[in-house]
């Protein structure tokens, strides 16, 4: 039985559209890497774009409502929502770095970026729970 590769695990996480499932997948990839369950092989390409949920529609910042300074409940909810989006994108960025450049770098580089992805996944949970 061949060991799953770090590249295939990263690719699967990047192709996960649901934000909470992606956060869990990032934590699982990092855990599997730490425990030696993933081979240091880059046998599948990183997707050109990570998967995104169908809704909500992503809009450019200039088309989004102003968040205010967090004084009102509505403003605080908007702020938590924005933070959740930032964490979601940060998961993808860290996974992409590990998958796209890991073969040219080393295991420490991959481990560092998988750790970042897991940390962002952990941070996504409370932010996502607030939105």
Language-model features and meaning:
Residues 1-131:
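Non-heme di-metal
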């Amino acid at each position: 039985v061949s060991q799953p590769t770090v590249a295939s695990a990263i690719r699967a996480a990047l192709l996960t559209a649901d934000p909470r499932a992606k956060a869990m997948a990032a934590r699982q990839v990092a855990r599997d890497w730490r425990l030696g369950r993933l081979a240091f092989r880059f046998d599948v390409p990183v997707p050109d774009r990570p998967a995104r949920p169908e809704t909500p529609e992503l809009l450019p910042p200039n088309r989004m409502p102003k968040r205010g300074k967090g004084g009102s409940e509505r403003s605080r909810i908007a702020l938590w929502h924005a933070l959740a989006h930032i964490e979601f994108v940060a998961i993808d960025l860290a996974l992409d770095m590990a998958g796209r450049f890991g073969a040219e770098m080393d295991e420490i580089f991959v481990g560092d970026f998988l750790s970042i992805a897991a940390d962002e996944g952990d941070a996504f949970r409370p932010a996502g729970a607030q939105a």
